[in-house]
Amino acid sequence: MKRLFIISATSLVMFFTTPTQAQQNADSMMIQTILQEEVSSWNSGDAQVYSKHFAENGTFTNIRGMFFTGHQQFLDRHVEIFKGMFAKTVLQQDVVSFRFLSPDVAIVETLTWITGFPKGGSPKAIHIDEKGRLHTRLLQVFQKQAGDWKIVVYHNVDLKPDTPVPTHK
């Protein structure tokens, strides 16, 4: 009887945890796809695609500390920078931290670097290293809304000259 109970309990645990792990893996892949889309759309200067996963009521802070609310402001700001100071730049990013706070909320922090600024054309008051790279730390909070992952918080800060920067891959 005791053996039957242990087998039954183990089976129930496996039954209820396997779909959760499988779902978390699927959600992780969906978020990873969004991160890859961010890079490819930035590199092609496509603000529409770059902004498509940003929530209607999302908030974001850019590298200058300016705060914005809403999808339209996020889109408008990226249209502006892709035509201006970040035109034809190249974004790369490495995931530093990725964790789920709940089945519907994930936090992703990336170390980013941007290259391709024209000589003397980098953004004012932002540190560009000796190799012409702007380094930032980007924290994004994702929330699952109606089955889709949306960015509800986007907080980007530039790394100051005395901040150690890990070696890029």
Feature map (PLM): residue ranges:
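Positively charged n-region of N-terminal signal peptides that target proteins for export
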Residues: 1-4
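N-terminal hydrophobic alpha-helix used for membrane targeting or insertion
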Residues: 6-7, 98
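Aromatic-residue hotspot detector
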Residues: 14-17, 100
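Sec/Tat signal peptide C-region and signal peptidase I cleavage site
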Residues: 18-22
